[in-house]
Amino acid sequence: SISGGTDVVGCLVLGNIFSKVYAGEIQGESLGIDVDIFDENGKKVSKNKKGELVIKKPFPTMPIKFWNDPKNKKFKNAYFTKYKNIWHHGDFIQKTKNGGFIIYGRSDATLNPGGVRIGTAEIYRQVEKINFIRESLVVGQEKEGDVKILLFVVMNNKNKLSDSDIN
């Protein structure tokens, strides 16, 4: 497993031959990349807490600008507006007690049903509090000029979704 992007032409976290493999985890940081995890206030989070994937120092494959962006406005808006002088990648991530990483998806995914903007992260935050759901996926379905929010869930073990669970 890996996490990175075409914008960085590589991986930010990836597997390695020196660390144990745990189900659902990515083993470690890429060489030369100062990966960290911040909360919404720009403070480092402790292990086993989810937060924003950030890179605190310039790294070998970091783009230096965007094409046709002479004043670097688009470039700065893409990566450096959430935290001052810190690369904000736009992914939710957690460092586990094993030293590995779990990626939870985009932190900047926004849906717009009925003209009301809502980030998928807000929905995931609530769904994660429900103990009978193991995994979930939120998507927007465009229909007749609007967006319908769809939530797909995988139940824990042998649980079945019932009307009382929904209500």
Regions inferred by a protein language model and the residue ranges of each:
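AMP-binding/adenylate-forming catalytic core of the ANL superfamily
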Residues: 59, 85, 90-167
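Conserved AMP-binding/adenylate-forming
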Residues: 1-2, 6-100, 107-110
